[in-house]
Amino acid sequence: LLFDFDGTLVETASGGLYAKDLTDMKIKQDVVNRALDLMEQNGVKYFGIISNQCDVGVGFVSDEDIDAKINYVLRCVHDLAVKRGIRGVVYGHYECFSIDEYDPMMKPNPGMVYKALGACRLMMDGITYKDIETMTLMVGSASGLPGQFSDSDKVCAEKAGVDYMDVIQFLGKDLDLNYVLSKEHTSEGIVILNNDHIYILENPYGVDLNI
């Protein structure tokens, strides 16, 4: 199991879109509980976090602070797993601090996923790399859906050759498919389908879509 971090495993405690500081964080317990269910039912052996952390690259926070946040979340997941009797799981994390969109580690590039799959391959005797790909599920919150800033998580999974679910689907919640299909994020902006016509709003948010 591979997870994006911000917006997927954690959210801001303040309810804001962006964290006020490093303490403005709340673990999404429903996501963790669903992950624990899968770990218990399917014998998951690896729980990993892969996350772009560009704030480090621009000097807003330190890599030590980000590592502390992510390791805290992994420790919480580990402790909850042990309480359920789930043992033998390896917990790992990979972050990209770069602001270079061509960095192979920066999502939507698949470098961090490749590293995680390589770690799984080393710990599983008799399993091929292709087997690891087939058994891996990545969960994220940048799927190109309405209200999301990007599709970088989804594209990353596709490039890496692993299955992908948006965190909403991971929780078993239904998406409004008519709404989703009417508004799609692309590298050019948001595509709106209306009366058999296609309209493209070029980057309406005025920010880099990171695709």
Predicted regions and their residues:
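HAD-like aspartate-dependent phosphatase fold
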Residues: 1-211
